[in-house]
Amino acid sequence: MLQRSPRAGPSRAQGRREAAETGGPTTQEGVACGVHQLATLLMELDSEDEASRLLAADALYRLGRLEETHKALLVALSRRPQAAPVLARLALLQLRRGFFYDANQLVKKLVQSGDTACLQPTLDVFCHEDRQLLQGHCHARALAILRARPGGADGRVHTKEAIAYLSLAIFAAGSQASESLLARARCYGFLGQKKTAMFDFNTVLRAEPGNVQALCGRALVHLALDQLQEAVDDIVSALKLGPGTVVPELRSLKPEAQALITQGLYSHCRALLSQLPDTGAPLEDKDTQGLLAVGEALIKIDSGQPHWHLLLADILMAQGSYEEAGTHLEKALHRAPTSEAARARLGLLQLKKGDVPGAARDLQSLAEVDAPDLSCLLHLLEASERQSLAQAAAQEAGTLLDAGQPRQALGYCSLSVLASGSSACHLRLRATCLAELQEFGRALRDLDHVLQEALGDGDLPRRAEDFCRQGRLLLSLGDEAAAAGAFAQALKLAPSLAQNSLCRQPGRAPTARMFLLRGQCCLEEQRHAEAWTAVESGLLVDPDHRGLKRLKARIRREASSGCWLQ
């Protein structure tokens, strides 16, 4: 009957309901009088009944008779000096009366007792203002303990004591305990009780989803639990809301933890930038808010890291703020003058100004060093800009190849491939360049991509030449069997063109000999159809080759009963 509703700040409907249930001040005073009379009668029947004594004290408190309440509680305390329900009531009462030293001693005894089960029903009796006094006192006491906390094992003892005070403050505050919950969560984190700390941070965030300190705290707990992605997500959310709070928090971390978080934030932004629509259109403000917050925070944490300046430059370019991006690129180049990544970004800015050859010159330096980074940069361009860039790069590559400079041409070749979206003509150009550099494996991979494309009606001659190139590369790698297969495909698609190409390289006699060896091998393994194909292909190259003619006759004899020759 004496307990307050635990709800703080009731709505109008709730207020009407509570008024109906408890009545106005006069009704409440009448209830308290009745409770006091009943408790007094119970004490007369049983003088040892402590519950009745506490009930009487609570009724006196509700009636505003604080001196009598104090006396009644002192009697109860004399009977049970360590009783938590009595200590809690006396502490609240002494705070209300202004006797802070006595209140502090009582709270200290209550903390030492470790009995908190009684607190909620006890505190429900007291008015909101008195509960606030207890919360403020306990919270301040906990902070004082933490400020004076020594190192080592004694520090853990002090932290546990602070947790006890904070728990009292949380009980007293009810739903308005965010500061105490945050402080207690940090204490649990200090003690290594990560999941308990997480519980307190989550409690705060359920009530205040935008609490920046709680987001930061929970992020650090996630980090301690090896949940890097969750930690990064919380930090990003916090940075959107209050970067001024987050940055000092991150700068205070140990180097190892700070490196994990900053690298995670960097990777997060890079992943988002790589997912941009492939249109080159500037991002809207809502899309760049989080990216900008992270980019600016990384520079505030460590302005000497060139990668952070490059990231912010990319974000600004994605937003369309090219002049501001140029400022950060100059800072990155000042710290790393030979950075291909920074020069490539300057090239992108040149392209935006219309200098396509200059852009190609700066961008090609990154093509062979960090192709994924260059691909992300090219996402920031419009389709027409990428097309112009691919053409300019291919033209310069062709000039360098004609001049006998394949090493200098390679970057331009790779730039043309990336800017064109791996167009077949640019892949062929790079394969030629790589072959001159004797990087046969890479050249072969480029041709494989070309050969995987769908074949148009008028593309047979070109496809035949691609197979001839593939075969030559396979020969350079020592795979004669696969080379023979590629040459056979070319002869099947365009016999005349393939004959002329193979007679030039590797030459009529070497090609015929290769088909002869291939046919003999297939025949020994009883693969008659493949042997026949090899012989027929070889005779297309050299119709008068005696060895191929003899092998053809032998295949006929051995398979005279089969129908596979038809």
From Swiss-Prot:
Repeat among keywords: yes
What is this protein identified as? Tetratricopeptide repeat protein 34
Transmembrane helix among the record's keywords?
Answer: no
Q: Where is this region: Disordered?
A: 1-29
Checking InterPro entries in the record gives: TPR-like_helical_dom_sf, TPR_rpt, TTC34
Pfam families found in the cross-reference section = TPR_16, TPR_8
Q: Write the record's keywords in alphabetical order, separated by commas.
A: Repeat, TPR repeat
**TPR repeat intervals:** 50-83, 178-211, 212-245, 306-339, 341-373, 424-457, 464-497, 512-545
- Transmembrane stretches, start-end: none
Q: Which organism is it from?
A: Homo sapiens
